[in-house]
Curated annotation (Swiss-Prot):
Motif PPXY motif, residue numbers: 35-38
Note on domains (UniProt): Late-budding domains (L domains) are short sequence motifs essential for viral particle budding. They recruit proteins of the host ESCRT machinery (Endosomal Sorting Complex Required for Transport) or ESCRT-associated proteins. Matrix protein contains one L domain: a PPXY motif which potentially interacts with the WW domain 3 of NEDD4 E3 ubiquitin ligase (Potential).
GO biological process: viral budding via host ESCRT complex
Additional remark text: Most abundant protein in the virion.
The protein's assembly and partners: Homomultimer. Interacts with nucleoprotein and with the cytoplasmic domain of glycoprotein. Interacts with host ATP6V1A; this interaction plays an important role in virion uncoating after viral entry.
Recorded GO CC terms: host cell cytoplasm; host cell endomembrane system; membrane; viral envelope; virion membrane
Keywords: Host cytoplasm, Host membrane, Host-virus interaction, Membrane, Phosphoprotein, Viral budding, Viral budding via the host ESCRT complexes, Viral envelope protein, Viral matrix protein, Viral release from host cell, Virion
Subcellular location, record wording: Virion membrane; Host endomembrane system; Host cytoplasm
Disulfide pattern: none
Membrane topology: Peripheral membrane protein
Protein name: Matrix protein
Natural source organism: Rabies virus (strain China/MRV)
GO MF term (any one): structural constituent of virion
Gene: M
Length: 202
């Protein structure tokens, strides 16, 4: 048991560095490659409460014995209760976490690291969402620990408003990202102006 505790401690404390400040990625940056079911859209016509954000997102899944997405989804179902960041940006964080986890992970010791660095376009309904010019630095660890296994999620999201053109994606409703957003109870409604885009309600 002591050995397991040491492993878990090492796993949690392996990387204590703060994420680097958000900077705009080059246009050809492919740190995150979307799965095949993501289809690029030409443009977003609506200008209603629309903002571009330069985003750095990282989700580090840590487990000495491996993990399954069933457990990750179970952990994320309690996201609203445990989220400790700026609540005006909780919708943005959910989108970034879902996109990051739907990409390809990179092994790092006992961890699997999912990273996302994009310029993303977000639309909020009415007066919801972050204030003009508001920035986010969010970091949190969520753990699942029972008699049989330990899984830790280290989530980091940095976001600041920017004026660089973002990439727009239409996502298949059966994609992994949509499953994760459903688990996290992401609140959206279809945009009246753009049939392929949604407005965030949080």
């Amino acid at each position: 048991m002591n050995v397991l505790r040491k492993i878990v401690k090492k796993c949690r404390d392996e990387d204590t560095q703060k994420p680097s400040p958000v900077s705009a990625p080059p246009y050809d940056d492919d740190l995150w490659l979307p799965p095949p079911e993501y289809v690029p859209l030409k443009e977003l016509t609506s200008k209603k409460n629309m903002r571009n954000f330069c985003v750095n997102g990282e989700v580090k899944a840590c487990s000495p014995n491996g993990y399954s997405f069933r457990i990750l989804r179970h952990i994320l179902r309690s996201f609203n209760e445990i989220y400790s960041g700026n609540h005006r940006m909780v919708g943005l964080v959910k989108v970034v976490v879902g996109l990051a986890l739907s990409g390809a992970p990179v092994p790092e010791g006992m961890n699997w690291v999912y990273k996302l660095r994009r310029t993303l376009i977000f639309q909020w309904a009415d007066s919801r969402g972050p204030l003009e010019g508001e920035e986010l630095e969010y970091s949190q660890e969520i753990t699942w620990d029972d008699d049989t296994e330990f899984v830790g999620l280290q989530i980091r999201v940095s976001a600041r408003q920017c004026h660089i053109q973002g990439r727009i994606w239409c996502i298949n409703t059966n994609s992994r990202a949509c499953q994760l957003w459903s688990d996290m109870s992401l609140q959206t409604q279809r945009s009246e102006e753009d049939k392929d885009s949604s407005l965030l309600l949080e």
